[in-house]
């Protein structure tokens, strides 16, 4: 407290209630190919319904990406998804048909297109890049001729003809209102041609117009705020409307679209999916690199090629050290005549025999039903294995193994591309590949819990790696409270008193068998203190999952006491 110069009472508070916070370990991450949705921007997806809403239904080009995500979401409910696009060949559909535009996401639109008339795109662009945007049509009614309004194809979607809003009327203006309709012209979004997707009644041409609750009613802002399908890029019929449209309301009589006998209707075109290559997918995965910006724990790779899988392992997991990457072999490896050898060769050659406790590899692909296209598809299992980890976190804790009959049951399996027999399982497992198997009466199971770490270590098991991720994330967050404090006995004691109760809880929940926290003058020497450093050493003995069971059945003669033979066989 400050020194007092005269008598008085000063009240102060000291907060010593710091605890180790909960650390998320169930958040999935994926980057891949989709028909729709923001590109190179992570979106949170909570369910398959939300996945369809944001990234649309799968087709033949996007099915593996879609179902990798959908499969994870059958086990967990927190997924970050990034869409990959090709900067050269992927294009955004425009009202003008100009095929040179790629507006990747909301951030790019707001920075480059929101505030200025572009001219070359026409009045509207699809909200997201891809050929799906070519299915969109926009119709605008912006005049007060009742007879002509009654003949407008979309008249019945509105209560009345547009006129003058109360806001503009109060400002001495007139004729600012307009109606906008967004139509699925080709039926690619809704399944039915001509379906009206969105309507925007009585929006304003005045840039400062407000609605009844004080939000902007300027039609550009309303479309930006509410539409799932389009962005504004210019005023319709710019030659005749630019003088008044987009100006303030005071004293303005806003221009009609000149041809009062018709609405201003335009179909978007020139959208293209492009050819997505490995580098594009890696660019999408790069959005997960910074642990300070985005928190993820379970990174799936779908059917990504080996270069992309290695990028995810080396540039994301090994860099962040707070997440695990899940990979599968190529479909060709598990449908060959020698699948065990081919999967191991993929592990050793294509994946460069990478050694990392932050990576997990499974043995194959599954056959599952695609309800959106009424067909069956082969899908890699890494989305399911990551999902099993998420489900394990929810039902128990991250330090439990996700494998086996209790927690390793794989969902939505018609059949496996490869059923590894015992000899094959031995070959796969000693090379760090976790077999996925089917047993009669038990279903399809993840039957291994190894990481891709090559050397013998506690960290060559998934549960131990994820235990340490959980401990490190939680305790490091608690340690931030010690930043800029003094490195003295009080601060060290406070740190120990924060960490030890947390570790006792983990021990009680079977994550560790014992622990010790050292944070005193023995490791915070005067030299450490003078370097403005603070050291806490945390020793733990992790619990180990059972991988091998031996059952000994011993026949004993009648009249022989069991005490005589127990321990001697």
What are these regions (language model features)?
Residues 140-224, 228:
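Beta-strand-rich solenoidal segments
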Residues 12-13, 97-107, 132-169, 519-521:
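Charged, amphipathic alpha-helical segments
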Residues 1-104, 108-116, 122-127, 171-175, ...:
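Structured, hydrophobic secondary-structure cores that serve as assembly/anchoring elements
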């Amino acid at each position: 407290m400050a020194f007092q110069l005269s008598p008085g009472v000063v009240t102060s508070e000291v907060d010593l209630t710091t605890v180790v916070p909960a650390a998320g370990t169930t958040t999935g991450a994926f980057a891949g190919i989709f028909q729709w949705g923001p590109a190179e921007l992570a979106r949170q997806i909570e369910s398959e319904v939300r996945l369809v809403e944001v990234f649309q239904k799968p087709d033949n080009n996007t099915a593996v990406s879609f179902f990798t995500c959908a499969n994870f979401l059958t086990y967990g409910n927190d997924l970050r998804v990034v869409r990959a696009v090709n900067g050269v060949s992927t294009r955004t559909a425009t009202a003008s048909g100009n095929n040179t535009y790629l507006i990747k996401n909301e951030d790019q639109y707001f920075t480059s297109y929101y505030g200025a008339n572009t001219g070359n795109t026409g009045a509207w662009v699809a909200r997201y890049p891809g050929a799906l945007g070519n299915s969109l049509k926009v119709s605008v009614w912006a005049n007060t001729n009742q007879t002509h309004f009654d003949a407008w194809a979309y008249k019945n979607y509105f209560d009345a003809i547009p006129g003058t809003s109360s806001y503009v009327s109060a400002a001495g203006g007139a004729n600012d209102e307009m109606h906008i309709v967004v139509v699925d012209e080709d039926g690619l979004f809704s399944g039915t041609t001509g379906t009206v997707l969105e309507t925007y009644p009585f929006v304003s041409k005045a840039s400062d117009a407000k609605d009844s609750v004080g939000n902007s009613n300027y039609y550009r802002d309303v479309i930006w705020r509410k539409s799932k399908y389009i962005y504004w890029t210019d005023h319709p019929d710019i030659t005749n409307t630019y003088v008044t449209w987009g100006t303030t309301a005071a004293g303005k009589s806003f221009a009609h679209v000149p041809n009062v006998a018709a609405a201003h209707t335009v179909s978007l075109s020139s959208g293209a999916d492009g050819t997505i290559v490995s580098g594009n997918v890696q660019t999408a995965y790069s959005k997960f690199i910074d642990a300070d910006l985005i928190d993820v724990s379970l990174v799936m790779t779908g059917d990504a090629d080996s270069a992309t899988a290695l990028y995810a392992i080396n540039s994301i997991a090994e860099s962040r050290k707070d997440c695990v990457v899940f990979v599968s072999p190529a479909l060709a490896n598990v449908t060959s005549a020698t699948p065990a050898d081919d999967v191991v060769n993929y592990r050793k050659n294509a994946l460069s025999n990478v050694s990392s406790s932050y990576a997990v590899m499974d043995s194959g692909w599954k056959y599952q039903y695609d309800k959106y296209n009424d067909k069956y598809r082969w899908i890699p299992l890494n989305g399911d294995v990551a999902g099993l980890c998420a489900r394990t976190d929810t039902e128990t804790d991250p330090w439990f193994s996700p494998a086996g009959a209790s927690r390793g049951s794989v969902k939505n399996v018609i059949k496996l591309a490869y059923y590894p027999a015992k000899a094959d399982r031995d070959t796969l497992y000693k090379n760090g590949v976790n077999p996925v198997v089917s047993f009669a009466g038990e279903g399809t199971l993840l039957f291994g819990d190894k990481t891709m770490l090559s050397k013998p270590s506690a960290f060559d098991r998934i549960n131990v790696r994820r235990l340490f991720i959980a401990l490190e994330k939680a305790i490091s967050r608690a340690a931030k409270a010690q930043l800029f404090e003094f490195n003295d006995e009080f601060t060290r004691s406070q740190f120990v008193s924060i960490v030890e109760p947390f570790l006792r809880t983990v021990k009680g929940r079977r994550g560790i068998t014992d622990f010790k926290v050292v944070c005193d003058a023995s490791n915070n020497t005067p030299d450490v203190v003078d370097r403005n450093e603070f050291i806490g050493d945390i020793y733990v003995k992790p619990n180990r999952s059972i991988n091998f069971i031996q059952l000994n059945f011993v026949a004993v003669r009648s009249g022989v006491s069991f005490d005589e033979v127990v321990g001697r066989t």
